Each structure stands twice: as C-alpha cells, then as structure tokens.
Regions:
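Active-site activation/catalytic loop segments of kinase-like enzymes and analogous catalytic loops
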Residues: 248-262
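ATP-dependent phospho-/nucleotidyl transfer catalytic cores
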Residues: 25-29, 53-54, 60-65, 119-139, ...
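ATP-binding pocket architecture of kinase catalytic cores
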Residues: 45-71, 75-153
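ATP-binding glycine-rich phosphate-binding loop
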Residues: 17-43
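Active-site beta-strand-loop-beta-strand hairpin of nuclease catalytic cores
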Residues: 39-49, 230-232
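Conserved active-site aspartate in kinases
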Residues: 238
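Juxta-kinase regulatory segment immediately upstream of eukaryotic protein kinase catalytic domains
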Residues: 1-25, 73, 77
Length: 262
C-alpha cells in the first residue's frame, strides 16, 4: 500500500477544500490506514488542519459501505450533540466531502481516500496514565452508545459475531498455512476448551435477553480524543468498525485494553 507523491497530489485535487491544501507529511502511528496531516491555508490568512487517510482495502473490503456508515452515524451524532447544547465540530468526526459530493475520493489507482477535520486542542493517549484516563474513556464510550441508542442498528451491514469469529479461528488452525500452530499448541488448546463460551452472548441476543445496539467494536483509550485543557474525553474516533453488536462486547474490549499491564 505504498503511496507516491504524485498520487498524493492527485488526491488533493479531488476534495472541496476551503482554501489551499499543503501536505505536511505522515501523521500518527496507526497500522491500518495511511494517515497524513494537511494544512489548509484560507483566503483570510487562517490555517486549518485536516487529516487525510488512505483506506486500507485489504482490511476494509467495502470502503463505500464503511463511509456510508460513518456518514450516517456522524450525522446522527451531530443532531444529538446540538440538541444537548454541545459542540458538533469537536464532539464528533466531521468529513470533508470530495468535489463530487461523496465522502471519499477514488484515485486513478483505485485507492479510496477520505479527509477529516482536525479536532484542535485535544490529544489521544496510547496507554492509561491514571484512573481518571480510564474513567474518561468509559464515560466517552458510554456517551457514544447513549447518543446512538435511537439509531437504527439494523441499517448498518455486518455484525460482530463471536461465534463466527471462533469458527474462522478453527479453520485457520486446521489449515495452518504458515506452519506455526505447533509452536502455540497450549494456547490453541486453551482457546478451544472455551468454545462454548463464544456462543453465550449470541444466544442471549437470539433469545431477546440482550438488545442489539450500534457498537464501536474497538473501545481503546487511543480512540478517544481527550481535551488538552480539561483532560476530559470529548470525541470518539476511528468509526470504521461501527456496526450492530452488543454493548457488553464494547465494555469487555475496553477492560481488556485498560486493565492490561502488557
């Protein structure tokens, strides 16, 4: 997924900027998408920062659907934030549209690109530095689910299905394409011995004992923008994995990340 300077310049011509975009270079330490920082010089002399991303099609097989999901979710969030007297420019992601009105641009190589407005005065943290950080993460993701509680989950394709993930795992172990299963036999046995646990939540959902929600599915601290001045969580980011699921999975994932000492 290497990117050339020519490709980047082509991409910049595809978006409706409020000024002249100037590429600043690679940004952040994400491992899935290629991310770049842009400075947009407006006619009044102001400078706005934006985030340019090349979507990884090896991971996201249907980038158009991903962006449609994000637009639907963020539009809903904006409405709810305004109703609550909040700031929709800082409390949810905002997408810059391409010149054709779409929330993405497809370059001549068939690669998909998107641009987000930069959230100023806020930062992401790679690890929990205090109990308050963990609390702010929980508060932010809880608020995220609350704001989306009346969003129709069934309109989003896909589902976070642990039972299906387990079936995929068993097939991968059996195929052992890279010949590495032997080295982790104990770990594999540990997982296989708990196969029945993989279906518990799905069975509760099917029985109507747990509700289907719109879930984030990657509830890590570094997917929260924390205000630099107040040290409070203000915005949930990385919405690529948003899909119908169970809120308890989001809770468990956040505990896994925050409580780990590894």
């Amino acid at each position: 997924m290497s990117v050339t300077e020519k490709q980047l310049q082509e991409v910049l011509t595809g978006f409706e900027f409020p000024g002249t975009p100037v590429l600043q270079g690679v940004y952040g330490n994400g491992h899935i998408n290629h991310t770049y920082l842009l400075h947009v010089m407006e006619q009044n002399g102001n400078k706005k920062r934006m985030i340019l991303q090349q979507m990884n099609r090896s991971v996201f097989k249907k980038p158009v659907e991903v962006m449609e999901n994000i637009m639907g979710v963020t539009s809903h969030l904006r409405r709810k934030i305004v109703e609550n007297g909040g700031d929709p420019e800082r409390e949810t992601l905002n997408v810059l549209l391409a010149k054709d009105g779409k929330p993405y641009y497809v370059d001549s190589c068939g690669e998909y690109w998107r641009i987000y407005h930069f959230i100023e005065g806020a930062s992401c943290y790679e690890q929990v530095e205090s109990e308050e950080d963990f609390y702010q993460s929980a508060l932010s993701f809880g608020n995220f689910q609350c704001l989306l509680s009346d969003y129709p989950a069934e309109t989003i394709p896909g589902f976070h299905d642990t039972k299906q993930r387990f079936a995929n795992f068993k097939r991968a172990v059996e195929a052992d394409v890279m010949g590495r299963a032997k080295a982790v036999e104990r770990e594999i046995e540990f997982v296989l011995a708990r196969e029945q646990d993989a279906a518990v939540l799905g069975n509760l959902l099917a029985a109507g004992e747990l509700p289907l929600r719109v879930t984030h599915n990657d509830t890590k601290l570094n997917n929260i923008m924390i205000d630099d001045a107040t040290r409070q969580g203000i915005c949930v980011i990385d919405l690529d994995t948003v899909m119908p699921g169970l809120s308890v999975n989001d809770f468990g994932d956040s505990i896994r990340f925050g409580a780990s000492t590894a």
